[in-house]
Amino acid sequence: MNKRVKIVATLGPAVEIRGGKKYGEDGYWSGKLDVEASAKNIAKLIEAGANTFRFNFSHGDHQEQGDRMATVKLAEKLAGKKVGFLLDTKGPEIRTELFEGDAKEYSYTTGEKIRVATKQGIQSTREVIALNVAGSLDIYDDVEVGRQVLIDDGKLGLRVVAKDDVTREFEVEVENDGVIAKQKGVNIPNTKIPFPALAERDNDDIRFGLEQGINFIAISFVRTAKDVEEVRAICKETGNGHVQLFAKIENQQGIDNLDEIIEAADGIMIARGDMGIEVPYEMVPVYQKMIIKKVNAAGKVVITATNMLETMTEKPRATRSEVSDVFNAVIDGTDATMLSGESANGKYPLESVTTMATIDKNAQTLLSEYGRLNSDSFERNSKTEVMASAVKDATNSMDIKLIVTLTKTGHTARLISKYRPNADILALTFDELTERGLMLNWGVIPMLTDAPSSTDDMFEIAERKAVEAGLVQSGDDIVIVAGVPVGEAVRTNTMRIRTVR
């Protein structure tokens, strides 16, 4: 059995060699990126189980991210496997501003009072922390006295105790000992801020990524379907309508509008980091299960992300609770699990991917016993959906080793994946964009092939490719799903059970 749960690994300096130095060594950032050496490290991640690489545009410029993407393309050749490319937008963030002078961070003690400035374009001092707000918004009028301001994923909490209408600054009280560093994320829970749907930087980043040939875009802080539609318009305008859009759900507004967002997007990323700050933390696992269930029913891809193996950023082994977290996400029905800092800037990127792959593969063997996905409740509202359901029934009733589907758009493979059949899904397609677009679907092994010349040729190709890929051998039973007659614009209408010769 192959690993059916997909892994998204975030790339960063952890796997990159610069000037002969590894990340963390003196002089690392002054060196030039060694593409070949870095590609060898990334190839190891692919071999360990990474299916798609995430490029986090909250960090780095176009030059850095472009070099990173080029390195992955070389790594694909070294590993002999293709992967997906996912661009994650910075989104409408609030961050602490740059500091005056040479200061790197300021320390504070509980009960201390300082001020927070909302005026844009100024630098921070120890007494007045300035905020950099997406869209250059002045959020003074949006934040009420009594609200909490959380710095760096909640590591430092501030409470607004007064507002100064003259300076348009908040007086805040420090709630715990800690530090404030420059350019750290800021969250203000239970506060609606009128961010633009798409910041100018995000627009530029998306267009750059499309030029590089990305396959997926994760849209940060999605609040309504309109946020997704704006990005979709850019993709279509530039001739990239095939690029799949993942809405990141990370605040209460996104949760409240979840149904319309699922309908508008191609998939959902459960971004638990900011979600755990923006909503009560005890609700995060509740929302995770709810989101996975809804996305499963819609037949779309769901990625569970953030802090999954956080300990492995610094240590070579995951905690028992982290192992349970990854396991339970798979049991809940996630299509993919994601590594963030673990693979981007951690000390053990390869071990993190290997560990996640091991947990994912173990969990998938227990889906029939413990899995929460109930495909019996899915609406079968098309011939293809009925066919996908029948394929699952066949794998449950017989010892089917493999499902092979010939698909032009990937639609049939996605529907079969939706039902979580008890066999791998080999998706043979004639379009490389479709091949890469299936990199995140549960259980799907996408592969490029020549278009068949006839129906008989189609079945021969399906069997031959399955054998060549090492997925089956003589005597194994396989299910082949396709639309016939070949060459005509027909939907999937044929399912054949065939014994490999």
What are the residue ranges of the model-derived segments?
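Non-catalytic helical/linker scaffolds that mediate oligomerization, partner binding
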Residues: M1-R501
